Amino acid sequence: MLAAAAAIVVLVLALPPTGAKAQSAQDRELLLKAAFLYNFAKFVEWPTGAFAAENSALTICVHGDDVFPVIAQAMNGKTVGKRSLSVVSRPRPPASAGCHISFIGANEPESSYVGHLKSPNVLTVGDRARFARTGGMVGLVTVDN
């Protein structure tokens, strides 16, 4: 009886905690990119008029359904100065109205965003090698992963 109880305790201790998820390599990479976006938000100075009010949130628009959940969760509850961060998902083509940072995921077709990169007061960040060459401001590129 004691051996059976000990075996049950060992099995219970070996189980992962409820709600625990293994982090994939892609999720770890997205968390790193979210950290870059957060640091960009901390160090960019937006022009007068970029915010509706002094206490308006800083909005990061994420274009790409495959990357939105991880980035949104990583930014949850964060602030930049006195501003809260708001992370929203935007459909194709990227609508940049109300965005301060526009992040375009690697799976978004180039044709869906190229014409929308010249929005005033918006820092455009893309997850592909040619992003900066096609009019984006910051291109995040993985080299020798």
Predicted regions and their residues:
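Short hydrophobic alpha-helices and adjacent helix-cap/hinge residues
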Residues: 1-145
